[in-house]
Structures are given as structure tokens and as C-alpha cells.
From Swiss-Prot:
One of its GO terms (cellular component) is cytoplasm. A divalent metal cation 1 binds at D217, D228, E425. Keywords: Aminopeptidase, Cytoplasm, Hydrolase, Metal-binding, Protease. Belongs to the peptidase M24A family. Methionine aminopeptidase eukaryotic type 2 subfamily. HAMAP family: MetAP_2_euk. GO terms for molecular function: initiator methionyl aminopeptidase activity; metal ion binding; metalloaminopeptidase activity. It comes from Neosartorya fischeri (strain ATCC 1020 / DSM 3700 / CBS 544.65 / FGSC A1164 / JCM 1740 / NRRL 181 / WB 181). This is Methionine aminopeptidase 2-1. Residues 34-45 have a biased composition (Acidic residues).
Length: 444
């Protein structure tokens, strides 16, 4: 989920996730096949021994015959995804992300005994992140296979969100359930010049078109450990250079990120990578520009936008990344001006952490605040989520919470009309010994 640079806000590896599942399935199949071969071999050996042994051989044959094990089929994900990942990993040991060793002056961390000890102490914390990451991988890979032009954005968004809730095992319909697991924030489906924070509200009839460039940005969480990852879908290869530029820029940011690294250095590296690309559209060459007022960000428990920003252009921010922090490294490229403004109807909202206590005169605002606190806490939500909980005629109260400084609204962020924007994003953990790209998968 994008972090925007505004004065208002300033004030306030695995390629093995599916690979592991496939490997496990393959291993089960191979084991069962091996058992069948062993049984067959035993029977052949017994048959050869029978003429020599007679009745005694029959007894020996019975003794030598191996006992067949019960063959339990490997658990696999359904289509659409509905099997909780906890059922696929019953020992609660989830695949780790891509492991990247620290470089330069931080290379000692990989072998330092004290750092290794600290890393082992964080196992529960890591398993929650890895479980959420596995949910994200399985859901997004299904989405990539099935999303097609002609679908409504509502159908796409709800399909992704329903899958995340099913795989985390938290439907979010009971008070407090969504705080335990489920959607980390609403599924963003931002089209073409719209770069971020667009999800359909009730009644939206927008349909995905063949020539669209759609950013798919959603989060999954377990116990508030939010995995924030995004990708861009197109159905025309003419946009491939744009996607390649943004993917390269994001991977550059991931490579440069690390403990004690300055934000300005990361931004400079990202910009250099991104702006080395250009894309030809309708016979005109367009340089790919970084969207300079969109950033990556750190992630705190139950809070998608922490207090630090990761720029995607060169700047003077001397803030450093620190050990134990979690960051969403996301980059946005555009064929337009490389600058976004708020536009279109707002759908995303979030309770402001440590918001001041303000007397509310509207009873609808008071009631809605109670619903938000009990169901979302500081996790972002959208209007469809309130509809899903059975809330009605809440818009006046919601706007009152926004104007009172209790809830933050996140309007869609758009470049100039006619331009195209793309996004790729991963969540990384700055562990004491290594950097873990927790959301990495076979797809990106």
C-alpha cells in the first residue's frame, strides 16, 4: 500500500513457496511409488524363493512380505483458494522468504554468534510473517492465472479478499476476528493513470479492459504482521518495458536496503534503475519516470504505514534503516509527469494511531467509531468492508470522523490522464543476521 509524501502526512527465497508445496506433493508421490516398488520387489523375491522352500518358504514368504503403509494423499490448495494454509503446513513451519546476506560493513552479521542467537529468538514473529506471506503468494498466483478482461473490478477485488480470509482462517465477521488475521488492507485495483489507493465502492460497475494497466496491491496479515506486496497486470506486451523498469527498480531497492543504510542512498539507486528505461506507445517513446511523491514505508504491527518512508528518487533524507524493522519496498513508474494528485471517489480509510480524543456530536460517528475499533483497529478498511458488516447509512458519520482527525482518508492517487503507471512491491524483514524478502515468490 503506497505511502504518499504530503505536508498533511508529514505533520502527523524462496522461489519455493509453491515450489515447497509442489516439492512436498512430489515427495509424497515418490514415497508412495517407492513403497509400491518395494512391495512388488518383495513379491518377486518371494515368488523366486517359493519353489525352494515349500511350506517353509510360504511361512518365510509371509514373514518377508512388507506391510503396506496407508497412503494419505498430499494436501493441496483448492481452486479458488479456500484451504487454510495452516492445514497445508500442520507443523506451523512456513517457508522462509528469499534470504539475502548483508553486504559491505554489515557482512559480519551473517556469522556473528550473538546476532544468530537474536535471530533464533524471533521465531514466533517470523512464522506469523511467513504464514501471511504464504497466503499472499497462493492468492496472488491464483489471481494472476484467472483475472481476465471483461471482469468487473468488484468481482476481482472480492475474489482476492475472500481467498485471503479463507487461507488465513479469519472471515472477519465476528468482532475482533479481523484483528487476528485476514486482510491487511483493502485490495487496491488502480487502473492506468491511477497509481494507488483505488478499490471499488458498492455499486461500482467498472470493467477491466484489454488495454488496461492494473496495479494489484493487497495485504495479508496474521496477528497484525502485515505482508504488503503488489504487482502489475497487463494484457498487451507493448507495456512490458514499463513493467520491466518498475520491477528492476523494486529489486534494486531491495538489494540496496539494509541495516544502517540511509534512505537517500536507496532512493538514488531506485531512480537510476527506473529512469534507464523507456517505452514506446503508439509510435512515441516515453521515458519511464519515478512517481516522486510516492514512497515505500516501514510497517509496524497492525499499522501499515509506520513512521519511516523509503523514497524512490534521489533526496537528502539521512534517516537510516534499523535492525528488526520491516519495510515495504515499493516503486512506481509512469509515462506521465511522475507526480500524483488526489482524484476520484475515496474508498480507503484507517484509524489514526494515537488520535486525539475528540468529542463527537453525531451519534452515527460514535457508533461507527466503535465498529471500527472492534473490527479493524488501526488496520485500513474500505467502504465495502463496512457494508459487509451490515453497516448502513454510515457515510455522514465516516466523514465526521475524518474531519475530526480520528480517521485518515486515502483518496486514489493519479498521474495525468492518458498516462500509464505500474507498481511492484515486496515486504522485507531486516533480521539480525540476514535480510529476508518475505513475500518473494516464483512470480516476482
Amino acid at each position: 500500500m503506497a505511502a504518499q509524501v504530503t505536508e498533511k502526512l508529514q505533520d502527523l527465497h524462496l522461489n519455493g513457496q509453491n515450489g515447497d508445496a509442489k516439492a512436498n506433493s512430489t515427495a509424497v508421490g515418490q514415497t508412495e511409488a517407492g513403497e509400491a516398488e518395494d512391495d512388488s520387489d518383495d513379491e518377486k523375491e518371494d515368488g523366486n524363493a517359493a519353489p525352494e522352500a515349500g511350506a517353509g518358504g510360504a511361512a518365510k514368504k509371509k514373514k518377508r512380505k512388507s506391510k503396506k503403509k496407508k497412503k494419505g494423499g498430499a494436501k493441496v490448495q483448492s481452486s479458488p483458494p479456500r484451504v487454510p494454509v495452516s492445514n497445508l503446513f500442520p507443523n506451523n513451519q512456513y517457508p522462509e522468504g528469499e534470504i539475502v546476506e548483508y553486504k559491505n560493513e554489515n557482512s559480519y552479521r551473517t556469522t556473528n554468534e550473538e546476532k544468530r542467537y537474536l535471530d533464533r529468538m524471533n521465531n514466533d514473529f517470523l512464522q506469523e510473517y511467513r504464514q501471511a506471506a504464504e497466503v499472499h503468494r497462493q492468492v496472488r498466483q491464483y489471481a494472476q492465472r484467472t483475472i481476465k478482461p471483461g471482469q468487473t473490478l468488484t468481482e476481482i477485488a472480492e475474489g482476492i479478499e475472500d481467498a485471503v480470509r479463507a487461507l488465513t482462517g479469519h472471515q472477519g465477521l465476528e468482532e475482533g476476528d479481523n484483528l487476528k488475521g485476514g486482510m491487511g488492507f483493502p485490495c487496491g485495483l488502480s487502473i492506468n493513470h491511477c497509481a494507488a489507493h483505488y478499490t471499488p465502492n458498492a455499486g461500482n460497475k467498472m470493467v477491466l479492459q484489454q488495454g488496461d494497466v492494473m496495479k494489484v496491491d493487497f495485504g495479508a496479515h496474521i496477528n497484525g504482521r502485515i505482508v504488503d506486496s503488489a504487482f502489475t497486470m497487463t494484457f498487451d506486451p507493448v507495456y512490458d518495458p514499463l513493467l520491466e523498469a518498475v520491477k528492476d527498480a523494486t529489486n534494486t531497492g531491495i538489494r540496496e536496503a539494509g541495516i544502517d543504510v540511509r534512505m537517500s542512498d536507496i532512493g538514488a539507486a531506485i531512480q537510476e534503475a527506473m529512469e534507464s528505461y523507456e517505452v514506446e506507445l503508439n509510435g512515441t517513446m516515453y521515458p519511464v519516470k519515478c512517481i516522486r511523491n510516492l514512497n515505500g514505508h516501514n510497517i509496524d504491527q497492525h499499522i501499515i504505514h509506520g513512521g519511516k518512508s523509503v523514497p524512490i528518487v534521489k533526496g537528502s533524507d539521512q534517516t537510516k534503516m534499523e535492525e528488526g524493522e520491516t519495510f515495504a519496498i515499493e516503486t512506481f513508474g509512469s509515462t506521465g509527469k511522475g507526480y500524483v494528485r488526489e482524484d476520484m471517489e475515496t474508498s480507503h480509510y484507517a484509524l489514526i494511531p494515537d488520535a486525539p480524543s475528540v468529542p463527537l456530536r453525531l451519534s452515527s460517528a460514535k457508533n461507527l467509531l466503535n465498529v471500527i475499533n472492534k473490527n479493524f483497529g488501526t488496520l485500513p478498511f474500505c467502504r465495502r468492508y463496512l457494508d459487509r458488516l451490515g453497516q448502513e447509512k454510515y457515510l455522514l458519520g465516516l466523514n465526521n470522523l475524518v474531519s475530526s482527525g480520528i480517521v485518515q482518508d486515502y483518496p486514489p492517487l493519479c498521474d495525468v490522464k492518458g498516462s500509464y503507471t505500474a507498481q511492484f512491491e515486496h515486504t522485507i524483514l531486516l533480521r539480525p543476521t540476514v535480510k529476508e524478502v518475505i513475500s518473494r515468490g516464483d512470480d516476482y
